[in-house]
C-alpha cells in the first residue's frame, strides 16, 4: 500500500555556485530562423545561457508534473531549498501538492546571489528532508486510525541536486546523511514519538551537475546499499542534460514506459494548405506494453538524441470517434502525460483528444504485418492509453479447420489424450507401502511416444481400419508382458509381413493418408516397420519386448530394409525427436562412406537451394574437365617418376617415318579420288 515512491523529496542546492551559467547558449535571433548556440555565437547574434539553478528548477518541476499527472492524489512530491538554512517550499498537504503553489514559491526564492555566507550548504536541506520523511501523510494518518502502536510502512526517496568537488566530498555527504537518518529513527522509536514515523528505508539519489564542457572529479556510481536503511546512487550530469536524466530516472522510480507516436499529420503554421508529420513522446504505466505484447509481437524501440532511455515507437492511425467496439478488446487503461508539454505537437495532440476524438496506434508484427495494439482517448478531462488485445480471446469465434500446426481440428487425438491423462493421474499416499512402485518405476511408466495428430503417425492412423491393431498396440506397452502376449504379437507381425509380400496397400481412408495412397506399398510398409520398431524400443521393459524387437529387425532385413549400425545406435535418440513421416536422413550404406556422404551432401544442397555462386561455377568446371582426356604423362607414368614432355621431339628416325607415312597416305588418297572420278 505504502510504496517507496509514495514520498519523494527534492533538495535543491541554493549556494553561490548555482548562479553561474550552464554554458549552453540559446539564440535570440527568431527572425532569422532557428539556430544553435554555436551558430549564433559565430554570427555574433544575441544569445543567453541559463544558470545552473534555472536548469535544476525546471527539470525538478517537470519531474513532479509528470508524477502528479499520472498519479493524482496518491504520489507526493516535496521541495526543500538549502543555502544558509533549509527553506520548506511545500508540505504533504494536498493543498500544496500542485504546480501553481510550487512555481510561485520558486519565483520568490530566485537565483542565488553571488556574495553569500560561508554557512551555505546543502546539508541543511538533507537534514530537513529526513525530518520530512518522518512526517506522516494523510493516507498514513488514516491507516493509523489514532493508534500510535500500529506499525505503518514508511519509505521514501530523496533526490539531491548539488555540485561536489570530488569523491571525498561526496563520501562525506553520504556519511552525514546516514548518521542523521539513524539519529532520526532513534528519536522516533525510543520513547515512542507522537509527531512522526520511523523511516523503514530511504533511497538517496545525488545528481552532481556541472556546466557544459566542464569535467567533474566525481565518478558515477550505480545503486549501492550503504545499510539496511539507506541505498545511494550518484550521477554526474551536465546542466543542460539534467532533464533527460530525470526523465530516465522517473521511468524506474514509478515503473513507467515511454511511447513515441509517429507520423502525426499537422498543418503548418506558415502554410495552412500543407501538412507535415510530427512525433510526440508520452509517458504512461509500463503495464500498457506488457499486457498488450505477446510472443508473436515485438515492440519497436529507439533512443532519442540526447537521451539514454528507450522509447516504443507506434504509428498514428486514422482518427475516429470512440465507440464501444473499439474498447471491447481493451485489457487496461492508463493515464498519459506528454514529455514536452509546451511543444506545439504535444499541445495539438492533447487538444485533439480532449475534443472527444480517439486515435488508434499500430505496431508491426515479426512477419511484417501491422496490428492495432493501443488507443488514445480522453474521458473526464484526462487522457488515457488503452492496451488492446492483439491475440485471440475467448470471445472470438472458433478457429478455422486449417488453423494450428496439426491441420484440421478433427485430426487431433483428443480421445486418446483423455485416456492418457486418466492413466497418468497421481494420488498422494497416506503412508509408505513397500508394495507400491518406486520412483524409478513411475518414471518408466511415463509415455515416451504420443503423436498429437493422426497425420503424423501410421500405426495410430490405421487403428480404425485394422481390427487387431488396437489390441496389438495395447500389448506392446504392457510392463508385464508374458510369453503368451509375445506369441500373439509375433502372429500379428507375421500377418503384416504376409500382406507386405502380397503387395497389399495399407487401408488408408482419411485425407491424411491420401499422400501415402499414391506411393508404393513397399514405402508404406517400410514407414510402418520403422514406427513399430521405434515404439518397441521405447517400451522394452521385459525380455519378451527384446525378442519382438529382434524379430522385427530380422523381418526388416528380409524385406530389404535392414538398419545399419549407425542407424541402430542413433535410433533411440531419433525416436524422441522425429516422426515416422519425417524426411529421411541421407546416410551412407556402403564401405565408401566418404564418397556417399559427399554425394548426399551435394544432393541435399541442390534440393534445398542453398548452393552459392562459387559452388555452381566449380561444378560446371568439373563437368567440363571430365569430358576432356587427361594428359598421357599422368596416365602412363608410375607414381614417384617424372613424365617427359614431348618424348619423341628431336628423334630424326621417327620424324622421317612420320613424314614418309604422311606422303604415302597422301598418294593413296589421290589415287582413290582418281578412281572414283
From Swiss-Prot:
Residue segments, region Disordered: 578-604
Keyword Acyltransferase belongs to the record: no
Entry GO terms, CC: cytoplasm; INTAC complex; integrator complex; nucleus; perinuclear region of cytoplasm
Coiled coil feature spans: 515-540
Record motif Nuclear localization signal (NLS), residues: 598-604
Chief localisation class: nucleus
Post-translational modification: Phosphorylated.
Keywords: Cell cycle, Cell division, Coiled coil, Cytoplasm, Developmental protein, Differentiation, Meiosis, Mitosis, Nucleus, Phosphoprotein, Spermatogenesis
Pfam families: Mat89Bb (PF10221)
BP GO annotations: cell division; centrosome localization; dorsal appendage formation; flagellated sperm motility; meiotic cell cycle; oocyte nucleus localization involved in oocyte dorsal/ventral axis specification; posterior mRNA localization involved in anterior/posterior axis specification; regulation of fertilization
Keyword Secreted belongs to the record: no
Compartmental location: Nucleus; Cytoplasm; Cytoplasm, Perinuclear region
Bias (Low complexity) ranges: 578-598
Family from the record: Belongs to the Integrator subunit 13 family.
Quaternary structure, from the entry: Belongs to the multiprotein complex Integrator, at least composed of IntS1, IntS2, IntS3, IntS4, omd/IntS5, IntS6, defl/IntS7, IntS8, IntS9, IntS10, IntS11, IntS12, asun/IntS13, IntS14 and IntS15. The core complex associates with protein phosphatase 2A subunits mts/PP2A and Pp2A-29B, to form the Integrator-PP2A (INTAC) complex.
Purpose of the protein: Component of the integrator complex, a multiprotein complex that terminates RNA polymerase II (Pol II) transcription in the promoter-proximal region of genes. The integrator complex provides a quality checkpoint during transcription elongation by driving premature transcription termination of transcripts that are unfavorably configured for transcriptional elongation: the complex terminates transcription by (1) catalyzing dephosphorylation of the C-terminal domain (CTD) of Pol II subunit Polr2A/Rbp1 and Spt5, and (2) degrading the exiting nascent RNA transcript via endonuclease activity.
Name the UniProt record assigns to this protein: Protein asunder
Source species: Drosophila willistoni (Fruit fly)
Lineage: Eukaryota, Metazoa, Ecdysozoa, Arthropoda, Hexapoda
Gene from which the chain derives: asun
